Swiss-Prot record:
This is Chaperone protein DnaK. SUPFAM superfamilies: Actin-like ATPase domain, Heat shock protein 70kD (HSP70), C-terminal subdomain, Heat shock protein 70kD (HSP70), peptide-binding domain. The keyword Nucleotidyltransferase does not apply. Acts as a chaperone. InterPro entries: ATPase_NBD, Chaperone_DnaK, Heat_shock_70_CS, HSP70_C_sf, HSP70_peptide-bd_sf, Hsp_70_fam. Residues 597-620 are annotated as: Disordered. Induction: By stress conditions e.g. heat shock. CDD domains: ASKHA_NBD_HSP70_DnaK-like (cd10234). The gene is dnaK. GO terms for molecular function: ATP binding; ATP-dependent protein folding chaperone; unfolded protein binding. It comes from the Bacteria. Keywords: ATP-binding, Chaperone, Nucleotide-binding, Phosphoprotein, Stress response.
């Protein structure tokens, strides 16, 4: 086994490191720099440029220069974030089988292919640095990346000729790089604000174990968004002075983007900077120049809501971890955007602790990934990473209920099974709808995929045993299978991400679940009452048909009338829990006479004991 490199495939910049000689080392690229711009360009001569060379020619070739590709990785074309990206990015985003792709000179490229070109350069530069072939890597992703985004990242590695041994979450990787696994037992918060994504993770460390307690974030919040606020401000000022909408000119927009990014960086050390873009555009009166002073105070006011959004996520993640702010012993700052003074000031003020900035925020994630590579190779001993799944996973069961199989916050890798049954007599197949979210009802959660298990042997409802297994691997990628325990027939689905979950949706789901907690509970109670009523009506009708001859006519009619009344109540969509329970109780009382008649009959069948492992929920 050769050397395993750790790669931080970033939105703005990427970095790589290797673990050798009992330490992690950053690998410089061929240009001698520790980070490589995550930019790919296609020239008119047919050349493909990656990194610094692509960045240098971006102003003169904006429509064929691809940056921030991570923002559309695993994104569906019809999502709001895709429409937002279309407005912001100068290159053409197109629909490819429902997912986002880009079009350059009539050819369509997936985000995986573009990312693979970045990874190929990193791989080649690592081989040049190490003097040997590199075929294996650990690649980091934001903790809040969903299943489709993780798969897309792994596919990019495969396209680049890398065997991706592990997909690791960026905050967890950062914790390793800081050596937090070797400290006394502590509660650590990692605040990771990169170029395009934001993560906040609370971990417990000690005794060479790094355990994630809770994680949150936004895959569409980062330095790019801070740049965009400056771009919007400058373009609005320019329009008010000249009447020209500068953002309609892709070449001017690219110059504006570079100027905004540079201004942001300069304001990290200066209180004021000047943006000077001569000949930015022209109209009938001649060329126009953009010259504008931007103060740190103005920049902070333009981006204040973005900073506050990160603070609100800190608050919710600490709450999810079951902790208070005072229990956080250390705050680790990761990502280039944490250099913004106001970001540091707000985080420090909220947590009321000094910030740990001991490692370069642009390099720390790659360093951690290389340490994980060392763990997998066996060079690093006794380090255990325990990450978690950010949302609950389950299936839709009878009545449209979300039945959870793996709860939110479960340590991964994880594998869990539950046994379900059929909802109808002689049901030949079941449909398994895989869901992700925190709401009680299936329709309020995100559908990840659906598959059918065919060939179920004819049997009364509730008799077949269908074992559904959820398996999340160490990369956070999900496989769901279903098996008929009687026939042995099985079916499985690897969640393809065709309806992948965006991180903003995850955040919204958690908030919606909290807002609708009581309402959802009431709805679930009604559904459970209806399911119980339906089961009793079905079983009583079946028993009545078999043993009617053992009853007098009045008793038989009384039971049948009670069954009919309960069925009418079940069919009424507006029936309340109380109404369903009342009708169920009346039928149960009427059916006592049927039970007595069955007991008195010598050949009465004893009710079959229900399998303790069978979950009292049915799949349709």
């Amino acid at each position: 086994m050769g050397k395993v490199i750790g790669i931080d495939l970033g939105t703005t910049n990427s970095a790589m490191a290797v673990y050798e000689g009992n330490e992690a080392k950053i690998i410089a690229n061929k240009e001698g720099k520790n980070t490589t711009p995550s930019i790919v360009a296609f020239t008119d001569k047919g050349e493909i440029l990656v990194g610094e060379s692509a960045k240098r020619q971006a102003v003169t070739n904006p429509e064929k220069t691809i940056y921030s590709i991570k923002r559309i990785m695993g994104l569906m074309f019809n999502e709001d974030k895709a429409k937002e990206a279309e407005k912001r990015l100068p290159y053409k985003i197109v629909d490819r089988n429902g997912a986002c792709a880009i079009e350059i000179s009539g050819k369509v490229y997936t985000p995986q292919e573009i990312s693979a070109k970045i990874l190929m350069k990193l791989k080649e530069d690592a081989e040049s640095y190490l003097g040997e072939s590199v075929t294996e890597a650990v690649i980091t992703v934001p903790a809040y990346f969903n299943d489709s985004q993780r798969k897309a990242t792994k596919e990019a590695g495969t396209i680049a000729g890398l065997n991706v041994l592990r997909i690791i979450n960026e905050p967890t990787s950062a914790a390793l790089a800081y050596g937090l696994d070797k400290k006394e037992s502590e509660k650590i918060m990692v605040y990771d604000l990169g170029g395009g994504t934001f993560d906040v993770t609370v971990l417990e460390t000690g005794d060479n174990v790094v355990e994630v307690l809770a994680t949150g974030g936004d895959a569409f919040l980062g330095g790019d968004d801070f740049d965009n606020r400056v771009i919007d401000f400058l373009s609005a000022e320019f329009k008010s002075e000249t009447g020209i909408e500068i953002k309609n000119d892709v070449m001017a927009l690219q110059r504006l983007k570079e100027a905004a990014e540079n201004a942001k960086k300069e304001l990290s050390s200066a209180m004021e900077t000047e943006i000077n873009l001569p000949f930015i555009t022209a109209d009938a009166t001649g060329p126009k120049h953009l010259v504008k002073k931007l103060t740190r105070a103005k920049f902070e006011s333009l981006t204040e809501d973005l900073m506050e959004e990160t603070i609100s996520k800190i608050e919710s993640v600490i709450k999810d971890a079951g902790l208070t702010k005072n229990e956080i012993s250390e705050v680790v700052m990761v990502g280039g955007s944490t250099r913004i003074p106001k970001v540091q000031e707000r985080v420090k003020a909220f947590i009321n602790k000094d910030l740990n900035k001991s490692v370069n925020p642009d390099e720390v994630v790659a360093v951690g990934a290389s340490i994980q590579g060392g763990v997998l190779k066996g060079d690093v001993k006794d380090v255990l990473l325990l990450d978690v799944t950010p949302l609950s996973l389950g299936i839709e069961t009878l009545g449209g209920v979300m039945t959870k199989v793996i709860d939110r916050g479960t340590t991964i890798p994880a594998k869990k099974s539950q046994v379900f049954s059929t909802a109808e007599d002689n049901q030949p197949a079941v449909s398994i709808m895989v869901l992700q979210g925190e709401r009680e009802l299936a329709r309020d959660n995100k559908s990840l995929g659906k598959f059918d298990l065919q060939g179920i042997a004819p049997a009364p409802r509730g008799v077949p045993q269908i074992e559904v297994t959820f398996d999340i691997d160490a990369n956070g990628i999900l496989t769901v299978s279903a098996q008929d325990k009687n026939t042995g027939k099985s079916q499985e689905i690897k969640i393809s991400g065709s309806s992948g979950l965006s991180d903003s949706e995850i955040e919204k789901m958690v908030k919606d679940a909290e807002l609708h907690k009581e309402e959802d509970a009431r709805k679930k109670e009604v559904i459970e009452a209806r399911n119980h009523a339906d089961s009793l009506a079905h079983q009583t009708q079946k028993s009545l048909d078999e043993h009617k001859t053992n009853l007098n006519e009045n008793d038989a009619n009384e039971i049948q009338n009670a069954i009919n009344a309960l069925k009418d109540c079940i069919k009424n969509d507006n029936a309340t829990k109380a109404e369903l329970e009342d009708k169920t109780k009346l039928l149960a009382q009427a059916a006592q006479k049927l039970g007595e008649a069955m007991a008195n009959k010598n050949n009465a069948e004893q009710p079959k004991k229900k399998d303790d492992d069978v979950i009292d929920a049915e799949v349709e």
